[in-house]
Amino acid sequence: MYRKSALELRDAVVNREISVTAITEYFYHRIESYDEQIGSFLSLCKERALLRASRIDDKLAKGDPIGILAGIPIGVKDNIHITGVKTTCASKMLENFVAPFDATVVRRIEMEDGILLGKLNMDEFAMGSTTRYSAFQHTNNPWDLERVPGGSSGGSAAAVSARFCPIALGSDTGGSIRQPAAFCGVVGFKPSYGAVSRYGLVAFGSSLDQIGPLTTVVEDVALAMDAFAGRDIKDATTRDFFRGTFSQALSLEVPKLIGVPRGFLDGLQEDCKENFFEALAVMERQGSRIIDIDLSVLKHAVPVYYIVASAEAATNLARFDGVRYGHRCAQADNMQEMYARSRKEGFGKEVTRRILLGNYVLSAERQNIFYKKGTAVRATLIEAFQSAFECCDVIAMPVCASPAIRDTDVLDPVSLYLQDIYTVAVNLAYLPAISVPSGLSKEGLPLGVQFIGKRGADQQICQVGYSFQEHSQIKQLYPKAVNGLFDGGME
């Protein structure tokens, strides 16, 4: 059953080939059998999920209409609210926080009869690119348990890669869906800013965050977006970008002009560079023309991103003080000491580092030097993308400079920040992007290629990703690091 895409599972349910309860029990059995080695889930909602599965089976038995996600098991990153379920953001600060309401994406998934399996591990408050900054557990890459799955949506990528669920929700603030998707050999889609409601997402960078799906195939990205994309009265930043469905858009014509910022590829590991040019050749064989574009301003993207993101993080995380929200220290002599101790005990090192950086760039003495200049360069970067899209329909870029790194190779924080060079600009410019598996490195580790579109061109980007997937014949990659995960008689 794990070999079936979400679409195939839904069709099996509709055709009465299998019950939703049987599907749900099967995927819980996989999680309970193998996730101890991977560590993708922080918590499970088994009783809730099986109850919903039973209700959907009852609807089917009565001949009642069912939703487009009927019977599909879905994992949820642990910064997205599900009523009555803990939302910890993988932080001691929120270790005991129970969500009082559903995120809009969760509500829409359940309206379409999707089954929520549980909450997935992540870097604390979505700050990191290894999932090693979780306060509770490490998540290992299913391709090599000694390597990181990427981050911050590392639990989401690992769960889909291990086929614990065909769809997982992640959030992408600077590459946190696309990078782990590439590291784990799955598809990751970062929608345009405003395409998917952020209501019920614990904010990191409010002008950068976007919820999106991770899946095994692009068709399932389209299905997920059809279920939960679109305007939401609870999120004033959302827009109605789309006409028709994402699933219908997969059959559209492939864009003719694909732009590549070749001057920006020097930092790629050699086999990653070869793989990227092989991916471009796949698109050329479909009739697309590859042209060079100037995006030299991207050299400023990483410092601008860390100025803007850290400033927004410091502001958003100010609410977690032990009074309004979050962990409260056991003893303090006064209110100021209580604030300081609660935050010191509740936040990990990386979150603390970014709060300090954010407060520094927002300070009266430094705001003009850093934050205001950073936002000005961000505007220049947006203009550079707009100019590039006057010359091409889609931009192709690598997702990462290398495959997934080993635990022993985890770099110092600044070096890890520089690894975001191919992803953060998309968030700064509010654009959609999809990461699609593009093959394996010389070490047998998955690699990904990234297609970027104009803001609101999400359907076109999914179509490009689908076209690449079908013509490259790189589909449904199966990791082999966990014994029995794919050959242990669990069909």
Swiss-Prot record:
GO molecular function per UniProt: ATP binding; glutaminyl-tRNA synthase (glutamine-hydrolyzing) activity
Catalysed reactions listed for this entry: L-glutamyl-tRNA(Gln) + L-glutamine + ATP + H2O = L-glutaminyl-tRNA(Gln) + L-glutamate + ADP + phosphate + H(+)
Domain of life: Bacteria
Known partners and oligomeric status: Heterotrimer of A, B and C subunits.
Biological role: Allows the formation of correctly charged Gln-tRNA(Gln) through the transamidation of misacylated Glu-tRNA(Gln) in organisms which lack glutaminyl-tRNA synthetase. The reaction takes place in the presence of glutamine and ATP through an activated gamma-phospho-Glu-tRNA(Gln).
Family membership: Belongs to the amidase family. GatA subfamily.
Protein name: Glutamyl-tRNA(Gln) amidotransferase subunit A
Organism whose genome encodes this protein: Chlamydia muridarum (strain MoPn / Nigg)
